[in-house]
């Protein structure tokens, strides 16, 4: 019976990768809560146990679960064999678990498993690159940009590992690595998948809908994000206006051109639209933060922009895409019932609460309290969502 379950669980790549992603998302968030509640003391910085873990451990596994399914379909190639994606999964799972445990018990060896994780990531990149090269599909723009973003992630990951060495510019390099990993890797992959899949999902519900997408949209955004990474290295939010204003207007203009039929689609689709709008809100918030830095520098915006994207955009889309993929590939009807809609709404409340946490100290409120409250609620929502959807994954098909 166990063998039968094992075969079902690994019958599709998204099942083990999504399960692992949600597991480590929960574990690293619990670790974060324990540290900020003074229950646990770690001898590493938040860049490692929170930023690094989210960028290169958690979100990466969600991506691969999705990419290992859709990449061959995009390029009209044979599905990735179970033997290959199982090999990748076990490498990611083992190294992720070792990173998590080493951070708690012996952080001096964490970098060893980071190196192994990077090597695994390189093999995943090569796998996707080979599929891209073999394809005879003429238009491969979307998969090309996924690979470009993935390669940027490899460089960012390598830089972060190098920053573990104790030298004069190690902290500076670690920040460059996290910023480039966040924007050039995560943000670009999310954006590339979003502009490919969301109009596609929309047409499934509204057949006459046409999204007028700009051919050079991804290229322009990528160049501006490189500019943003350079500007962030100066550690002065006033300069962010140089990159954020053009990105804000370009993405806003693009989304307007898509003419998304908000009131003609079901919850399983409009939650994806909501995730897209967080891109615009995130850059708008960044612009507001920069103006405050110029005219009233006493106002503090603690990581508000990063979490606008990480929770508002990334996590909303992960839950939205994840729900749809899990239902569709398990033979269930692709519909968000009342339970799922409540999860969607609760997640948006948590995003707003995290943004409020970023500015609450300006009103004399307890920042740590609201930060921990947000993290605890987020873990609870993930567990509630998992009680239905990860259960489906664990059953397998």
For each predicted feature, which ranges?
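Hydrophobic alpha-helical transmembrane segments of multi-pass integral membrane proteins
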Residues: 1-397
């Amino acid at each position: 019976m166990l063998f039968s379950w094992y075969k079902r669980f690994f019958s599709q790549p998204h099942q083990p990768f999504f399960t692992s992603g949600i597991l480590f998302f929960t574990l690293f968030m619990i670790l974060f809560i324990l540290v900020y509640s003074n229950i646990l003391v770690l001898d590493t910085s938040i860049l490692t146990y929170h930023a690094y873990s989210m960028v290169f451990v958690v979100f990466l596994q969600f991506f691969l679960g999705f990419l290992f399914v859709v990449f061959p379909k995009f390029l009209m190639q044979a599905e990735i064999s179970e033997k290959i994606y199982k090999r990748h999964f076990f490498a990611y799972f083992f190294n992720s678990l070792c990173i998590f445990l080493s951070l708690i018990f012996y952080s001096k060896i964490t970098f060893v498993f980071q190196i192994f994780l990077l090597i695994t990531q390189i093999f995943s990149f090569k796998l996707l690159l080979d599929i891209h090269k073999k394809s005879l599909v003429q238009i491969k723009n979307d998969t090309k940009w996924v690979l470009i973003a993935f390669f940027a992630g490899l460089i960012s990951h390598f830089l972060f590992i190098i920053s573990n060495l104790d030298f004069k510019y190690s902290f500076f390099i670690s920040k460059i690595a996290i910023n480039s990993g966040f924007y050039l890797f995560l943000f670009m992959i999310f954006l590339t998948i979003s502009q490919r899949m969301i109009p596609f999902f929309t047409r499934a519900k509204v057949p006459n809908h046409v999204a007028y997408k700009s051919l050079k949209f991804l290229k322009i955004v990528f160049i501006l994000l490189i500019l943003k990474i350079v500007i962030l290295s100066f550690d002065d939010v006033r300069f962010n206006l140089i990159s954020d204003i053009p990105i804000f207007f370009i993405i806003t203009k693009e989304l307007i051109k898509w003419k998304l039929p908000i009131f003609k689609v079901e919850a399983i689709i409009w939650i994806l639209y909501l995730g897209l709008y967080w891109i615009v809100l995130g850059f708008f918030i960044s612009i507001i933060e920069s103006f405050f830095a110029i005219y009233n520098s006493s106002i503090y915006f603690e990581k508000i922009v990063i979490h606008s994207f990480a929770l508002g955009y990334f996590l909303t889309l992960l839950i939205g895409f994840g729900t749809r993929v899990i239902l569709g590939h398990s033979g269930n009807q692709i519909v968000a019932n009342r339970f799922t809609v409540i999860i969607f709404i609760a997640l948006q409340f948590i995003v707003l609460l995290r943004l409020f946490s970023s500015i609450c100290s300006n009103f004399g409120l307890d920042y740590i309290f609201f930060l921990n409250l947000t993290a605890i609620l987020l873990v609870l929502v993930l567990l509630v969502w998992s009680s239905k959807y990860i259960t489906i994954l664990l059953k397998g098909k």
